[in-house]
Amino acid sequence: MSNTDYQSFYDNFTPAVIEEQLIGSLKEGFNVCEEICDRWADGDRVGLSYEGITRPASQHTYAELKEKSARFANFLNSQGIGKGDRVAALLPRTPELMVVILGTLRAGAVYQPLFTAFGPGAIEYRLGTAKTKLVITDAVNRSKLDNDQGC
């Protein structure tokens, strides 16, 4: 986008421009997962291309992401997670992280990123400040939560 194009977009921007593109509405609300995943889940359209360092590259369709994130959202609901609850993920950048993010949004919860480079103190501070209800992690990062009394 050129500077001229950007300036024109900026000068003419209104919320109505965005709302025209949404399944839901800004006033009534919308589900972010439906907007960024479900609406594209027709056929074999690729929604995520993963280029791994420690594991093989892979591609994942929107339909696959929709199905997996729906299962994860159901899991969250079974754990008592609902609208507005904070769900953190302490995971590497993998397709599974995207499923956690989408499933959290699908459940109406708030996704809270925790970067794997954070130490235990930084993680504990963020979890406490946000009043996080659930942390999703893997075996590699689990020890970073050992001293957190809420985990």
Where are these regions (language model features)?
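N-terminal presequences and immediately downstream first alpha-helices
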Residues: 1-24, 133-137, 150
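Conserved AMP-binding/adenylate-forming core of the ANL superfamily
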Residues: 47-102, 119-124
